[in-house]
Structures are given as C-alpha cells and as structure tokens.
C-alpha cells in the first residue's frame, strides 16, 4: 500500500510539472490571441519549471521542497494557502467588490511599473487588452454560479495578456508599438468633418507659397523652432496674413502653439473694443479665426468647441474650396463687360432643354461604366505551377479583369493611333525653334496667334500659342507654353492684343527652369517694360478663397496711356485627387467674354486637361449628343492644339472631372472610384523618379517629372505628320492596280519589291 500511494503521489507531481510547464512556455502570440493551448511549447519533466519566471530580483518566488519521499515542507503548505486566499480575493473582485482598473499581477510578472500587488492598466496596452466580459460590472445577482467559471477564464486570459504585454514591452518595445499601430489603422474610422483631400490641398498650398517667404527666411525647415522664435512669429503674424497661414498650415508648428498666444490677438480695435475670448482657449484659435473672417467663413465650429488643429484647418480648407465667391471684384468693378458672357447667359435663359441635357448626362455615365476592356493582371496566372525544369513546359494562362479604367486606356490608344492623326502644317514653329520649349511639340499654323502689336513695328509675329474656340464652348481659350526668357515680350504683346482679362498659370513659381518669372512679384518690384511702349505693374496681391491659387492684380499701360487690368491666377494644379480647384477656375473663365490665357510648362498637359473638361461639359449642356463625349472633346482640342492630353492619366482625369461636375445629376460613380483606386495601386508600382519625401507621390501627379508613359517614347522617331488610311477591303481579294504606290502608305512606299 505504501508503494502504491507513493506511485500515485509521484504521478500527481508529474502532472503538476507538465501543467506548469505548459502555462509558463506559452508564446506571445497565444497570449495576444487568448489561446493558452500552444502546441509550440513542449511539456517537460524538469522540476525547475515549478520556479516562477522571469525571476524577480534573482530569487525564486515558489519552489517545492521535499523533506521525505511522501511529505511536503511546512513553508510550502503556507505558500499554497496564500495562493488559495489570493484566488478567493480575485473572485470577490470579479463580482464587483474592487475598482475597475485594479487587476491582480500574475505570478512572475515584471514589477517595474507598479506595486507587486496591484497594477493599473497602461494606455499603451488598451489595444491589446481590449476585450471585456459582456456581463462585467452589470451583474446584479452574484449568486449565478454558471457565469463565474466563464468570468474566471476570461479574467485569467486578461491577466496572461497583461503579463505577456509587459514582458514584450521590456524585451521588444518596437514590436509592441508596431502591433498597436497596425490595430489602430485597422479599426480607424474617418471623421465626418474631415476633408479626404485636405492634406493634398495643404501640401499643394505649401508648394505654391512664396519663394522668398519671410517665414522661410526666419525659420528654415531643418532648424528647430525655439520658444522665442515662435513668440516673435506670433507677434508678426498679427499684421501679416501670409505669415499667419504659414504658421497654421505648416506641420512643424503644430506642437508649438500655447494658450498664452491668445493674448497677443486680444487687442482692442479702432473703436477701443476688445474681442471676446473664445471658449476654445488653444493658441491657434484666434489666428485661424482671423483667416476665416477674411474669407467670410463661420468659425464658431472651432471657437465654441474644443477640437484639434488638424481637424479645424481641414474643415476650413474644405469650406474655402466650396465657397461660391471665387472671384475678386477688382476686374468686375473696372471692366464689367469683360466678366459677363452674353452668349452663355442667352443660352441658359432661352435655349437650354433641361430634360435633354439630363438624358445626355445619364447616357454619359452609362457609357463610361459599360465601356470596359480586358486588362491583364501582371504576375498572376490561373495555373501558376511549373512542373519540372524543362525548357518548353505547359503554358501558364494569364489572369484578366474587365475594368472601366481599362476601357478609358483603350480609348486613349485609339486617339493615339496614327489612323486618327490629323495632319497639319507647322512652318512657323519650324522657323522659330529658339522660341519653342520642345521642338517635338509643334504649333499648328491655322490656329496659332499671329502677333500684330505694335502697329508699324515688325518685332516678329510668332508665339507658341493656339486659339481654342467654337461650339460647344461658350468662351475662348488661348493655350500656350510657359514664357521663356526670350518670349516674355511676345507673351505680353499677345495679352495686350487680345484684351485678355485673366491669365491662368498652372505651374509652380519655384521652378524657374519650367517657367520664367514674367510678371512683377510684388508692388515694390520694378515694372516690366515691353518694346512698343507697354508697361506692366503689380497692383497688389489678392488672397483668394481657394487656398491653391495666388491672385495678382496687374495693370497694363499702353503706348497712348491706355490702361487695362488683368488678374493673374497661379496654382500648381498637379494633384489628381483635387477636383474642386480645377472646377472653380473653370467657372471663373466660363463667364469671361474675352479670350483667356491658360498655360503650363508645354501647354499640352494640365492646361489641356482643364480645357478638354470644359469642352466635354459644354458638349453635354448644349449638345450634340456623342456616345463618348470626352473622346470627342480631346479630338476637338487636338484639331486646334496638337499633342494635347499626353498620357492616359490625364485622359482619365478629364473623365473624373466631368463626372464630378455633374455629380448632382448622376450621383456618385462608386464603381469608377473603386476601379480608379485599384488602377492607382498598380500605377504606384511603376518607376517614378520623384522625391520620396514629397507630400504628393509621383504616381498621383498629372504630369510628373519622369512619367513612365512618356519616358518610353524617348529615343523613338518623331510621329510622322500624315494619316494612315485603314484598308476598306479587308477580307476581299485585292483588285489589280497599275502601280504599287496606289495601295502603299508613305511609310512603306520606300520598300523595294
């Protein structure tokens, strides 16, 4: 009997050893997932596994001591009794007799954060310890024994999670933070008051900032902003809107705002009245309120409510973009006839058929969604298995998708095909190569602007500019390249000759190699003089509601002291995610009765996107009805300005711009948006030679520095200036002809037979 009892006791001890080994050897992954049965940890018979780990201060908390083969020591029994009492206290706390945030420290857990008995949950562990028992803190009857075991199991899981997280934060803190960020991103929800494209607009506004900005000279980007420098900038920003906007919309100042800066803006006005202190006492509130008052935006949503700076400025940017008053009254007060388009007003009042227009727009959406093409998915196959190492094995069947963007790309390929090329003459640009930025982009002779100013003096009549006019447009555009150093005089001669009220520049002012500075930067700069007695002066800078554009008022003085006024709108419209700014500038130009000048670097990319979108919009408003109005608009534009719309990205952007303009009629095209995001993801994997630190990645730009769609054309011969005729007798026996030249195209007529 003694032998049997001894064997039974040893079996119990071995069971305790194996159970302790499994509990101690559980991996971090099982702790985080709540699974304590980890198959990766093998049980062991080593008695050392009974020692708590990790050991605290090098002393074991509990070790089994044997006085004989069959009895345990008295100290061991005391410790077992203490564990039982501790377990009983934990059950009492589980039933609601303790604080919510106080949890028991698991045996062997690190004690560097709190007392050994109790531990307060850290905020860093909220993402790991996120599950709570469904009935926790809500049980009114503590006598329900059925829920105690479930609550006990959940409590043990939480304890083990905390223990694992604490241990991991000591050993691998970077891994824990990375896991937390991944979980936060997975569960993140976009706030309703934020603008999805606000960051891109903010980045574009920073790009469009002044090159000689006073803020930039005081606080370089790579220099740390001190408290004294920040206080000086706040004092200077009270009277300077440009510095105020730089402080509010530059991310390096986000953490520098203090509540005491509000007192700087609490000055008395001319009447001696002191402004009311806002409920939101953060330091950036009063400066942002001054910006809102300047543009007529209601600021109570952040002055009376405590929200963060990022959310407030995103909402202000969106409200500035949605503002209907995008024009200044400077031109309308001086030349009211220049900003009143009688042709458009007459059509909208008397000729517009709203029902027919709505049918055209609905047909446009239906044709865009139905015009799909099969696109091969790169690197994916149905039978992606190679058997053996034979040179000639079974062919792999590629995967294809039927996509809307694929249909647009196919339409662009049809436009680029030499069969649809329209031959034109360009002798004037060939004779003035020094005035052309790119010799391969020719200027069409029949639509080019011939300079005739000044009368009686021949200074040359060539400028790389074309007139875009005729139905369905309501106004006239003049598309040109960015002025060069030797073409600034020709540019202003054209502006004076055509009586242009608006000049739209769609490139950055920080790239002098892509566009010459052809206007006075500030009112204090000297005027620009042009041969023929023309003088251009800066009359002031207007802060437009649209944060992307910088508006300069220019006064032109002619040879007979005649004065004309021009508004110069400059903005780097290169972000394909921004739909508001292009439509705002088109609304401004649509109401002009005189020709307006619009240019980018070569005059065939961003400017072409805006003009093509305007042609398609007017075509849907006025008619006639086309099955593919955007394709027809690009053909219409290329008949007047060849080489317009260079890449599929720009062609797709025109479709999205037109669909966004008619969103109140046709609703949102979710299928197009989803397909476009998928296409952007594939486009991001292509090679773009852009700055990795740029706020807008290269694959989202309309005209990046090195577009893969254009780079592949480098080294190829120039497109032949003739149209290839498609054979009209395909599938029939050819008739006999007298000569070979009657059936061969000019490219093949040089072959010898």
Swiss-Prot record:
Gene3D superfamilies per the UniProt record, alphabetical: Protein tyrosine phosphatase superfamily
GO cellular-component term (any): nucleus
Biological function: Inactive phosphatase which acts redundantly with egg-5 in the oocyte-to-zygote transition. Required for the polarization of cortical actin cytoskeleton rearrangement in the oocyte before and after fertilization. Together with egg-5, required for the cortical localization of kinase mbk-2 and for the inhibition of mbk-2 kinase activity in maturing oocyte until the end of meiosis I. Also required for kinase mbk-2, pseudophosphatase egg-3 and chitin synthase chs-1 localization to cytoplasmic foci after fertilization.
Pfam families assigned to the protein according to its UniProt record, in alphabetical order: Y_phosphatase
Compositionally biased residues, Low complexity: 35-46
Recorded phenotype for the gene knockout or disruption: Severe reduction in the number of hatched larvae. Simultaneous RNAi-mediated knockdown of egg-5 results in no viable progeny and causes endomitosis in the uterus, generation of polyspermic embryos and defects in meiosis completion, polar body formation and eggshell chitin layer formation. In addition, posterior formation of F-actin cap at the cortex oocyte and its polarized dispersal after fertilization are impaired. Prevents mbk-2 localization to the unfertilized oocyte cortex without affecting egg-3 cortical localization.
Keyword field: Cytoplasm, Developmental protein
The organism of origin for this protein: Caenorhabditis elegans
UniProt entry tagged with the keyword Cytoplasm: yes
Coiled coil: none
GO biological process: cortical actin cytoskeleton organization; eggshell formation; oocyte maturation; polar body extrusion after meiotic divisions; positive regulation of protein localization to cell cortex; signal transduction
UniProt-recorded name of the protein: Inactive protein-tyrosine phosphatase egg-4
Effect on the protein upon substituting residue 599 to A: Strongly reduced interaction with mbk-2
Keyword RNA-binding tagged: no
UniProt biased composition (Basic and acidic residues): 84-94, 129-145
Region (Disordered): 26-46, 75-145
Record domain Tyrosine-protein phosphatase: where: 408-661
PROSITE patterns: TYR_PHOSPHATASE_2 (PS50056), TYR_PHOSPHATASE_PTP (PS50055)
Location within or outside the cell: Cytoplasm, Cell cortex
């Amino acid at each position: 009997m003694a032998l049997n009892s001894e064997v039974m006791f040893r079996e119990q001890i071995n069971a305790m050893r194996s159970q302790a080994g499994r509990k101690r050897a559980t991996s971090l992954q099982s702790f985080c997932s709540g699974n304590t049965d980890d198959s990766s940890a093998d049980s062991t018979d080593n008695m050392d596994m009974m020692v708590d780990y990790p050991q605290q201060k090098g002393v074991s908390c509990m070790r089994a001591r044997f006085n004989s083969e069959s009895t345990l020591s008295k100290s061991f029994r005391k410790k077992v009794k203490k564990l039982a009492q501790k377990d009983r206290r934990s059950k009492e706390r589980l039933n609601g007799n303790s604080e919510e945030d106080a949890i028991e420290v698991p045996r062997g857990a690190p004690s560097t954060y709190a007392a050994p008995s109790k531990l307060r949950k850290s905020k860093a562990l909220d993402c790991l310890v996120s599950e709570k028992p469904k009935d926790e803190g809500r049980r009114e009857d503590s006598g329900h024994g059925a829920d105690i075991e479930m609550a006990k199991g959940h409590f043990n899981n939480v304890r083990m999670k905390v223990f694992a997280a604490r241990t991991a934060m000591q050993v691998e803190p970077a891994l824990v933070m990375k896991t937390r960020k991944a979980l936060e991103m997975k569960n993140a929800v976009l706030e309703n008051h934020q603008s999805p494209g606000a960051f891109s607009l903010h980045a574009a506004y920073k790009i469009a900032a002044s090159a000689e900005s006073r803020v930039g000279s005081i606080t370089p980007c790579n220099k740390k902003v001190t408290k004294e420098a920040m206080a000086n900038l706040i004092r200077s920003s009270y009277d300077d809107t440009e510095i105020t906007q730089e402080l509010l919309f530059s991310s390096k100042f986000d953490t520098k705002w203090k509540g005491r800066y509000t007192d700087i803006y609490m000055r008395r006005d001319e009447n001696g009245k002191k402004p009311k202190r806002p409920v939101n006492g953060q330091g950036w509130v009063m400066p942002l309120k001054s910006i809102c008052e300047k543009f007529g935006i209601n600021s109570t949503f952040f002055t009376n409510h405590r929200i963060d700076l990022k959310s407030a400025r995103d909402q202000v940017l969106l409200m500035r973009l949605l503002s209907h008053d995008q024009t200044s009254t400077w031109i309308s007060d001086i030349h009211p006839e220049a900003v009143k388009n009688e042709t458009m007003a007459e059509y909208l009042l008397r000729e517009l058929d709203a029902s027919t227009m709505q049918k055209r727009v609905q047909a446009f959406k239906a044709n865009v969604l139905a015009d799909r093409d099969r696109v091969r998915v790169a690197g994916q196959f149905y039978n992606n298995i190679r058997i053996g190492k034979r040179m000639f094995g079974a062919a792999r069947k590629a995967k294809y998708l039927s996509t809307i963007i694929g249909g647009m790309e196919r339409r662009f390929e049809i436009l680029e095909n030499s069969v649809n090329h329209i031959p034109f003459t360009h002798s004037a640009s060939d004779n003035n190569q020094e005035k052309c930025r790119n010799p391969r982009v020719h200027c069409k002779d029949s639509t080019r602007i011939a300079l005739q100013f000044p009368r009686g003096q021949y200074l040359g009549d060539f400028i790389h500019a074309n007139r875009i006019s005729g139905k369905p447009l309501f106004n006239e555009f003049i598309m040109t390249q960015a002025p060069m150093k030797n073409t600034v005089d020709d540019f202003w001669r054209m502006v004076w000759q055509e009586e242009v009220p608006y000049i739209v520049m769609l490139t950055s002012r920080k790239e002098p190699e892509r566009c010459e500075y052809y206007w006075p930067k500030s009112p204090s700069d000297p005027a620009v003089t042009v041969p023929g007695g023309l003088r251009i002066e800066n009359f002031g800078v207007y802060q437009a509601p649209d944060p992307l554009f910088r508006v300069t008022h220019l006064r032109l003085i002619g040879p007979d002291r005649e004065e004309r006024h021009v508004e110069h709108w400059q903005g780097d419209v290169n972000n394909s995610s921004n739909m508001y700014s292009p439509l705002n500038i088109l609304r401004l130009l649509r109401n002009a009765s005189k020709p307006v000048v619009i240019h980018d670097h070569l005059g065939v990319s961003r400017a072409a996107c805006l003009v093509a979108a305007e042609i398609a919009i007017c075509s849907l408003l006025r008619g006639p009805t086309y099955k593919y109005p955007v394709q027809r608009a690009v053909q219409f534009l290329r008949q007047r300005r060849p080489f317009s719309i260079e890449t599929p990205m720009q062609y797709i952007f025109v479709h999205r711009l037109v669909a966004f303009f008619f969103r109140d009629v046709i609703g949102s095209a979710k299928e197009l948006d989803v397909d476009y995001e998928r296409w952007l993801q594939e486009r991001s994997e292509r090679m773009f030679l852009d700055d990795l630190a740029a706020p807008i990645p290269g694959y989202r730009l309309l005209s990046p520095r090195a577009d893969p769609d254009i780079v592949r054309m480098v080294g190829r011969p120039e497109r032949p200036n003739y149209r290839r005729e498609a054979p009209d007798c395909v599938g029939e026996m050819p008739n006999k002809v007298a000569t070979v030249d009657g059936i061969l195209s000019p490219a093949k007529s040089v072959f010898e037979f």
